[in-house]
């Protein structure tokens, strides 16, 4: 069992050395620093590219309930009763 533990610890030590070695080397200068320094990043207050122009809201279905089918008989509030027209049959008034 100790032989297996020794191999495992040895492999861990070599992995640690591999990960530490590249980090200890000095960092190379960035590739874009070789570009001419006359080009400057845009410092204007332009809108970010991700923002889009204002759009009209998309029309969505406003009804969440299914349409209710009307019955053949209208309700009492919907019935239209014709007004009594007295012009064709005026009330008869008897003279005194």
UniProtKB/Swiss-Prot annotation:
Subcellular location: Carboxysome
Basic and acidic residues: compositionally biased ranges: 1-18
Residues in the signal sequence: none
Region (Disordered): 1-96
GO cellular component: carboxysome
Phenotype on disruption: Carboxysomes (Cb) are no longer evenly distributed over the nucleoid region on the whole cell length; 66% localize to one cell pole, 5% have Cb at both poles while 29% lack Cbs. Cbs are nucleoid excluded.
Low complexity bias locations: 59-74
Domain of life of the native organism: Bacteria
Keyword annotations of the record: Bacterial microcompartment, Carbon dioxide fixation, Carboxysome
GO biological process, one term: carbon fixation
Subunit relationships: Monomer, associates with McdA:DNA. Interacts with shell components of the carboxysome.
Function comment: McdA and McdB together mediate carboxysome positioning on the nucleoid and to prevent their aggregation in the cell. Undergoes liquid-liquid phase separation at pH 7.0 in the presence of crowders polyethylene glycol or Ficoll. McdA is an ATPase that forms dynamic gradients on the nucleoid in response to adapter protein McdB, which associates with carboxysomes. The interplay between McdA gradients on the nucleoid and McdB-bound carboxysomes result in the equal spacing of Cbs along the cell length. Stimulates the ATPase activity of McdA, causing McdA to be released from DNA.
Protein name per Swiss-Prot or TrEMBL: Maintenance of carboxysome distribution protein B
Organism encoding this protein: Halothiobacillus neapolitanus (strain ATCC 23641 / c2)
Source lineage: Bacteria, Pseudomonadati, Pseudomonadota, Gammaproteobacteria, Chromatiales
